[in-house]
């Protein structure tokens, strides 16, 4: 598997500890000692997960501090969007929207957009993604 590929990136962040390290780096611009202590993981776990994040091109190290690469920032944004889809009852709202997936003759685009807008009024990003899909 190529190091800089979608399957590799997904494989790296599918590990809970690696994902926690990745998110902590994004949120704190943390120094390596603080990261390990904050996450309560062993030295071996930490370096193993950091190695995967570095190889996948998601993080970089400068002066003992880790930060996200541009690719890492894109992946972080996608991860946060997905996490938000599972939080704040959004999952059930998305399931409700799925239940309205009927043939276009039964539910117009405007009606679909209105349902999405109403259910996801508090989450603009997910709402905008779904409305763009309806409009395409």
Language model region names:
Residues 21, 33-39:
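A short acidic, leucine-rich amphipathic alpha-helix
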Residues 1-20, 108:
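Short alpha-helical segments that sit at the start of domains
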Residues 19-23, 74:
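Pre-recognition alpha-helix immediately N-terminal to the DNA-recognition helix
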Residues 37-55:
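Short amphipathic alpha-helical interaction segments
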Residues 70-100:
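Conserved segment of winged-helix/HTH DNA-binding domains
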Residues 16, 27-31:
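Short capping segments at the starts of secondary-structure elements
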Residues 93-136:
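Exposed, interaction-prone assembly regions rather than primary DNA-binding/catalytic cores
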Residues 54-65:
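A short, conserved structural fragment
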């Amino acid at each position: 598997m190529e190091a800089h590929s979608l399957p590799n990136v997904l494989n790296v962040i599918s590990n809970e500890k690696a994902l926690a390290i990745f998110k902590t780096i994004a949120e704190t611009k943390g120094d390596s000692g603080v990261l390990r202590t904050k996450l309560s993981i062993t030295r071996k776990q930490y370096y193993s997960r950091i190695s995967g994040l570095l190889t996948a091109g998601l993080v970089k190290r400068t002066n003992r501090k880790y930060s996200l690469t541009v690719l890492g920032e894109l992946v972080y944004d996608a991860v946060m969007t997905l996490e938000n889809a599972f939080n704040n009852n959004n999952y059930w709202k998305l399931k409700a929207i799925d239940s309205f997936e009927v043939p276009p003759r039964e539910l117009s685009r405007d009606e679909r957009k209105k349902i999405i807008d109403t259910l996801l009024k508090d989450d603009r990003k997910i709402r905008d993604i779904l409305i763009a899909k309806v409009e395409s």
